[in-house]
Amino acid sequence: MRPVSWLFSGLARARRRRLQNRFQGRAFKAPVAVIGNISLGGSGKTPTIIALVKSLAARGIKAGVVSRGYGGRARRFPLEVKFDTDVTLCGDEPKLLALELSSLGCPIVVAPDRLMAVEYLLALTDVDIVLSDDGLQHYSMHRDLEIVLIDGARGLGNGRTLPAGPLREPVERLLEVDLVLINGQADIPGVRADGRIGLQPRLFRHLASNKTVAADNWRESRVVHGVAAIGNPERFAASLQSLGLEVLLHGRDDHKVLSPGDLEYADQLPVIITAKDAVKLGGPIPDNLWVLDVEMVLEPSFVDEFIAKAGLVAMDTGADRSAVNDTQD
């Protein structure tokens, strides 16, 4: 597989250079920051964007967000996503973004062509910066900043590109990006860490009644089913295990709509899902179904460095500068 991986790496480099040379001069009226990764699987992009938007808002900076809207079936794109937009039109991650950020007045636009999404958003409203949820390899879109997220637990795998490894681009691509953000506290050999993010379990939410229980006060059962249709189900299981729970993990394909068969088990133990999966649920809600809400925390020093590299000016709003959200991807 290694010769094929070398060929893939060479093609990825050639494509990047060709598109960068073609589109590098097509800047927008506001800076664009792409938040993505160079490896397959979930690394926490969506919750990181939510946390970053909140941190920027606390500093008086208004951000907008664009996304591909994977899974959305709207008849016409670009589509502005609001808190009451049907999830089937926009996809699960944009819906979650809208639920978390609508109170801040953060515009969210989806389109299969992210370039079109950025142009539509900037014609729709004025923002100080546009954040692109993924799109690191979408080189036809001009970007002023590139932020790469890496899951600390998985690192970069064997360091090889597809199909011999998990990487979409060669490791040396990290030398070209502006900031590297690691999800977790693990050190990755040969990779700099410009900042770290971390998920902290906050509370359990009973979907049928909307009752909440603080994460450290969970008394329902020590053994639970964890069901997650996200890019990295193991990270979700780790969040539950950090609370002392024994997790029967049921990972599903990313973006899958959970069916009754995914949520019903003969033992009637509590079933816990992610907030990303909860936005897609329809029909009757089982009485033993819960959502784990987590807090994503960004280091203030990373946010300050991001603002400086983007050429933005922060204002002292007197607001709390810690950014949290209740998502997990």
Regions found by a protein language model. Name each.
Residues 58-62, 139-329:
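ATP-dependent carboxylate-amine ligase
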Residues 7, 46, 97, 133, ...:
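Residue-level signal for inorganic ion chemistry
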Residues 1-10:
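Charged, amphipathic alpha-helical linker segments immediately N-terminal to NTP-binding catalytic cores
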Residues 42, 116-120, 235-236, 280-281:
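Phosphate- and divalent-cation-binding pockets in alpha/beta enzyme and binding domains
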Residues 69-191:
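Phosphate/Mg2+-binding loops and adjacent switch elements
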Residues 52, 56-57, 97, 101, ...:
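Hydrophobic alpha-helical packing residues
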Residues 16-83, 326:
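Walker A (P-loop) phosphate-binding motif
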